[in-house]
């Protein structure tokens, strides 16, 4: 199976991507998912084959999901619980003026 895939990134959540068949674009993606995802921003396009390696996803799962439901949703990697998120103003305290 060979598929030209459009990959969209979410403006709402870093690391969240939506893989779709380029021919169908976003037609098969449920409205509720699009509403939660935000306005999709085209990140890039790839030719997907079972032999291709993806950085964070199983290629066979991606291809199966696109064929069965019209899309594959890549969730952001889980953050470690011990990481504390600091306010932006604290992160800039040592920046030169």
UniProtKB/Swiss-Prot annotation:
Superkingdom assignment: Bacteria
Domain called YcgL: residue spans: 3-87
SUPFAM superfamilies reported for this sequence: YcgL-like (SSF160191)
Entry protein name: YcgL domain-containing protein PST_1364
Source organism of the structure: Stutzerimonas stutzeri (strain A1501)
């Amino acid at each position: 199976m060979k598929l030209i895939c459009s990959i969209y990134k979410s403006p709402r959540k870093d690391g969240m991507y939506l893989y779709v068949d380029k021919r169908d674009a976003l037609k098969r993606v449920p409205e509720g998912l699009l509403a939660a995802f935000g306005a999709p921003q085209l990140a890039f396009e790839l030719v997907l084959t079972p032999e291709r390696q993806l950085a964070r996803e199983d290629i066979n799962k991606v291809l199966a999901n696109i064929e069965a439901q019209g899309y594959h949703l890549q969730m952001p990697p889980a953050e470690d619980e011990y990481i504390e998120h600091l306010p932006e103003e604290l992160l800039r305290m040592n920046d030169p003026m």
